[in-house]
């Protein structure tokens, strides 16, 4: 019985010395062409889903962001990249989590909304407004000669004839070879949810120098100037279009040129992946200390990508100060004698 095969994943390795045996994941399989993708690639494998928080379940920093600055994060693992390039952005751009209507997009609890107040003015050729996710080690692990990656997502817009573009960057890390653009496509959105697929052809890694923290960057472009049109498969500029909403749901990136069906992760698994890069530790309290020379205490947390940047916010009483930070814990110090209350929160940032 023939089985469906997915091209370009290169999971089927044929041992020509034995024509009836296929080596698959270092194990011999009989009957040659066996490659049932959903069975053999777990959701945890980057080849199956390299996007983190593709179902927009995790929002540790908040649920609504009004006029976020370029480089700031919104939903976990997503950040804004904005270059007005001499123009004026719409007076209000809001990024928010919205509740999905059951049955509209199967398996989605939430979706990502960008609400725009007006079209903005005066954008030059180099202007852009993107929503970005960076995939850690994505260039090293997913890119190369003859390799492709496929992004799939649902989208809609209440703005008539609004376009959305998708493209990528192959980044070799700090001190590595120059960044390379992976040209994609653009789509004209309707008011109904539609699924869209974009396949990016990646570049050869031969002769390239890798620095620290190589990444594959995936960009959802909401506005672009004429100088940036080619990278989303267009030849003209695209403005914000006017007042209205742009909605995005169920973002996925698969290795190869096939958009596999979206499979939501368990929330606990998705949260754990997000917390490798950022974690918000809710209110903690230390009370009734009497140590004039100071007290050092430790807070443990889920291991981070690197030792995080720590932001301490005092809720009540005396604020602790940071003594040291490690990938899975921080040491804090209280130096005032006779402390009756120290209530605080911690933000731990280890983003790329």
Regions found by a protein language model. Give the residues of each.
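Extracellular "spike/adhesin" assembly and maturation modules
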Residues: 1-41
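Extracellular and organelle-lumenal recognition/adhesion modules and their flexible linkers in secreted
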Residues: 38-352
């Amino acid at each position: 019985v023939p089985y469906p095969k997915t091209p370009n994943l290169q999971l089927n390795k044929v041992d020509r010395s034995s024509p009836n045996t296929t080596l698959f994941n270092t194990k011999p399989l009989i009957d040659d062409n066996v490659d049932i993708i959903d069975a053999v690639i777990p959701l945890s494998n980057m080849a199956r889903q390299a996007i983190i928080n593709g179902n927009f379940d995790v929002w540790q920093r908040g649920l609504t962001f009004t006029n976020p600055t370029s480089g700031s994060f919104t939903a976990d693992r997503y950040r804004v990249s904005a270059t007005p390039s001499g123009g004026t952005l719409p007076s209000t751009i809001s990024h928010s989590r919205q509740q999905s209507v059951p049955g509209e997009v199967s398996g989605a609890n939430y979706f990502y909304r960008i609400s725009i107040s007006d079209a903005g003015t005066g954008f030059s050729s180099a202007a852009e407004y993107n929503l970005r996710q960076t995939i850690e080690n994505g260039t090293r692990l997913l890119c190369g000669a003859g390799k492709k990656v496929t992004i799939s997502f649902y989208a809609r817009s209440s703005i008539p004839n609004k376009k959305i573009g998708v493209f990528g960057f192959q980044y070799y890390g700090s001190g590595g070879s120059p960044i390379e653009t992976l040209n994609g496509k653009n789509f004209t959105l309707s008011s109904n949810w539609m699924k869209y697929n974009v396949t990016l052809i990646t570049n050869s890694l031969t002769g390239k120098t890798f620095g620290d923290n190589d990444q594959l960057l995936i960009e959802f472009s909401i506005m672009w100037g004429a100088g940036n049109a080619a990278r989303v498969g267009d030849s003209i500029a695209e403005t914000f279009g006017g007042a209205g909403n742009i909605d995005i749901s169920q973002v996925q990136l698969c290795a190869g040129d096939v958009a596999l069906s979206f499979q939501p992760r368990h929330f606990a698994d998705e949260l754990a992946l997000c917390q490798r890069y950022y974690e918000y530790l809710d209110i903690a309290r230390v009370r009734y200390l009497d140590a004039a020379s100071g007290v050092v205490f430790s807070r443990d947390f889920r291991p981070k990508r690197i030792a995080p940047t720590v932001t301490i916010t005092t809720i009540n009483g005396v604020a602790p100060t940071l003594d040291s930070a490690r990938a899975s814990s921080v040491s804090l110090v209280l130096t005032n004698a006779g402390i009756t209350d120290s209530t605080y929160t911690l933000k731990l940032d280890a983003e790329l």
